[in-house]
């Protein structure tokens, strides 16, 4: 029982995951012992079975698959988090019930204005105003890959190749998600009012290369954009999202302007050259949503997977269900000449 309790942490440690408070036995275990324990927990040892045959039987059990998956999940999540750190700072999660297309409705956070009350005045009832949300239906995308651990790997207690694959898939999921975020920004979709998200009329376009003057005008536009209820949004610039070729300039510009404590640079590799976006804090005005399957407990799912019998291996499936969408046209200014 103690071996099984320590097994997932043992796998996680072996593949290089950072494990907080690992089981005391985690470091001393090897894969062969884990596989044999899984076999014996499922069915007692038969008289004719050798150590190797017990190990082989254990590799085919659901228990061994779940152990591999639990250990691999920790590394996949950590590599995903490291790679996704930038785009997750300026996006917000949005739960969807299933994989069917869904419309995202944006409620205007400033749509109902508080009113000054006189003495004994009646408090008026406000009605939430729907913002011009994305009229295009969006949906979750599923990215997945199977990874196996061979009998030789188990015998040799060697998880280097497995570790490299799992870590790579966690990072790959984050890169694919970032690409969807970039496409959501660049798509300039039609909103619910029939007009495109970005246009001069919406006070959210600065069609010039990034420099101090352009940044200043974009900051002013965030302040002066109008909510659907007609209020000045008064939004403070929080994130400067740029294409890779603009990153150094963006960081130098913020440093020279004394804005490094106010505005944070984030880079999206899939943006066209010269592109930049200035966004408000997503807590004040969410603009870009990253889709998640409702009820999912993790951004990356790692599940046991039965490998083809001829491969003589145990396996896991690394899966990411994600998507991205532009939620509203306020709280963002698009810059660049691309």
What does each model-identified segment do?
Residues 201-205, 209, 213, 217-224, ...:
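Sequence/fold signature of self-assembling virion shell proteins
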Residues 1-66, 332-338:
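Intrinsically disordered, low-complexity terminal tails
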Residues 111-122, 145, 219-220, 294-302:
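Conserved short secondary-structure elements within globular domains
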Residues 54-143:
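Assembly/oligomerization interface modules of large self-assembling protein complexes
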Residues 145, 149-164, 168-225:
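Alpha-helical scaffold segments that mediate packing/assembly in large oligomeric complexes
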Residues 228, 233-237:
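Short gly/pro-enriched beta-turn/loop segments at secondary-structure junctions
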Residues 140-144, 235, 311:
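Short, solvent-exposed loop/turn segments at the edges of secondary structure
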Residues 135, 156-158, 232:
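Exposed beta-sheet edge/beta-hairpin loop segments within beta-rich domains
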């Amino acid at each position: 029982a103690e071996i099984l309790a320590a097994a997932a942490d043992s796998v996680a440690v072996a593949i290089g995951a950072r494990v907080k408070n690992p089981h005391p036995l985690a470091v001393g275990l090897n894969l062969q012992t884990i596989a044999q324990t899984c076999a014996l927990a499922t069915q007692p040892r038969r008289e004719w079975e050798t150590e190797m045959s017990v190990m082989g039987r254990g590799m085919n059990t659901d228990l061994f698959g779940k152990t591999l998956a639990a250990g691999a999940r920790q590394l996949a999540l950590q590599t995903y988090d490291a790679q996704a750190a930038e785009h997750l700072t300026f996006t917000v999660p949005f739960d969807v019930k299933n994989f069917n297309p869904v419309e995202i409705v944006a409620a205007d956070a400033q749509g109902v204005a508080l009113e000054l009350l006189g003495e004994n005045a009646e408090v008026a009832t406000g009605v939430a105003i729907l913002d011009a949300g994305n009229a295009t239906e969006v949906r979750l995308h599923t990215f997945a890959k199977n990874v196996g651990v061979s009998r030789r790997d188990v015998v040799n207690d060697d998880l280097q190749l497995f570790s490299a694959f799992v870590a790579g898939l966690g990072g790959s999921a984050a890169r694919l998600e970032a690409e969807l975020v970039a496409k959501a920004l660049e798509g300039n979709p039609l909103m619910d009012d029939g007009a495109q998200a970005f246009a001069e009329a919406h006070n959210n376009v600065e069609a010039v290369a990034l420099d101090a003057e352009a940044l200043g005008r974009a900051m002013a536009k965030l302040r002066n954009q109008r909510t659907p209820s007609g209020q000045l949004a008064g939004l403070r610039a929080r994130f400067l999202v740029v294409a890779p070729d603009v990153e150094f300039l963006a960081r130098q510009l913020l440093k020279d302007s004394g804005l490094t404590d106010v505005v944070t640079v984030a880079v999206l590799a899939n943006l066209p050259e010269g592109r930049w976006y200035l966004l408000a804090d997503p807590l004040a005005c969410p603009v870009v949503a990253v889709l998640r399957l409702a009820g999912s407990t993790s951004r990356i799912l790692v599940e046991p997977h039965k490998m083809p019998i001829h491969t003589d291996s145990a396996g896991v499936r690394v899966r990411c269900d994600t998507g991205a969408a532009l939620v509203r046209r306020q709280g963002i200014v698009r810059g660049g000449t691309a």
